[in-house]
Amino acid sequence: VSRFGASSLDVLENEPERLTEIPGITEKKAREMSESFRRQSGIRRLIEFLTAHRLPPELAVRLYRVYGELATDALRDDPYVLTDPYFHADFSLVDAFALELDVAADDERRVEAGILFELSYNLSNGHTFIPQPKLCAATAALLNLDTETIEAGLLRLTEQNRLVVDTVAGLQA
């Protein structure tokens, strides 16, 4: 701070090579300091973004590991990435966030995330099998959509090999 004054943070973030003007700071050390500062600043901005949208700040570190500086852009592009098990985000919070960002109620990403959430929810409650009509009805109720929209989402998930539908005891599940 004594060397660069009020522009210290700007130098640290945007002109790290100038840090070598300080005795004892090598180019390598200057790069490391700058990278650390940018990472911490990025996480801080991400936490501010998450909390402004009523999402838990604990998501910030995992999001930053996956997306880096592009984390907020990734969330704006597809908020349902948070429904990936890696993030452990509550579906209702993610869904409210997505709708806040003007994602359409019948958006394919929302429908598919809702189906996968219902499957995960049932599995966590000990159900290893759910008849397709029951899955579609439960997801339709969760998302407040018609079952035809859910069935179309289910078909997309199977075509993408993200889900397997099988017939057991005469029931598609």
Q: Where are the regions a protein language model picked out?
A:
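Accessory alpha-helical DNA-binding modules that contact the DNA backbone or grooves
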Residues: 1-170
